[in-house]
Design a protein with these regions (language model features):
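A short beta-strand-to-loop transition that corresponds to the Sensor-1 phosphate-sensing loop
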Residues: 1-4, 25
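Conserved helicase C-terminal RecA-like lobe
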Residues: 4-19, 32, 39-193
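Conserved RecA-like helicase motor-core motifs
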Residues: 18-28
Length: 193
């Protein structure tokens, strides 16, 4: 496929009929960084206890929250037997640093998106996340500052992702679908076409 964003429907059809496949010279649609990032945002909004999603997006786009800070948040979570999201709130309350402003902004956005989720559909939620997090701006800046043509297609992938949401009634149905796709991809035999 010349435009990588167009592979999604083809890939989903192959999975639906149980035909293993391999993408040559690229990644499967749901394995692309920008798609994984948006899915992680959606998973976290849907479930504040999703620590893997939290770790993926706490610093995406870059907020100056490094591995040391994430390690401290993780330690608070383990010591208090709470989610990393709740631990980040505790960390921000206990530490008066520049980073805690970024963490607080992140927390406030996640909580705001939970309200959006209650009042709007999953498509509007995704658009709100992309806009409020400045994720598309981040991709545009990456494309502008890079000579890698793949960076230009990332925004197309995001648009295709939003288009794919129309096939589902709600966020939970979509996330369940993606979970099954990823499970299927991980369990694929070595024989592929």
């Amino acid at each position: 496929f010349r435009v990588s964003a167009h592979t999604r429907s083809f890939e989903e059809r192959l999975i639906a009929i149980g035909l293993p496949y391999k993408i040559i010279g690229g990644l499967r649609f749901y394995e692309r960084k920008e798609i994984k990032d948006i899915i992680a945002y959606l998973r976290l909004v849907n479930n504040l206890g999703d620590d893997l999603a939290f770790e993926r997006v706490i610093n995406v786009p870059k907020r100056g929250i490094g591995k040391t800070t994430i390690g401290k948040i993780n330690q608070i979570a383990r010591l208090n037997n709470i989610s990393m999201f709740d631990a980040s709130r505790k960390f921000a309350e206990e530490n008066q640093t520049k980073i805690n402003i970024e963490i607080n902004n992140f927390i406030l956005n996640i909580l705001k998106w939970q309200k959006v989720k209650k009042n709007f559909d999953h498509i509007e939620l995704t658009k709100a996340i992309l806009e409020d997090s400045k994720y598309v701006d981040h991709l545009e800046n990456e494309a502008k500052n890079s000579k890698n043509p793949e960076n230009l297609s990332r925004i197309d992938n995001i648009n295709e992702f939003i288009e794919s949401l129309k096939d589902f009634e709600n966020l939970e149905g979509f996330l369940e679908h993606v979970g099954l796709i990823m499970e299927n991809i991980n369990n694929t035999d070595t024989q592929t076409i």
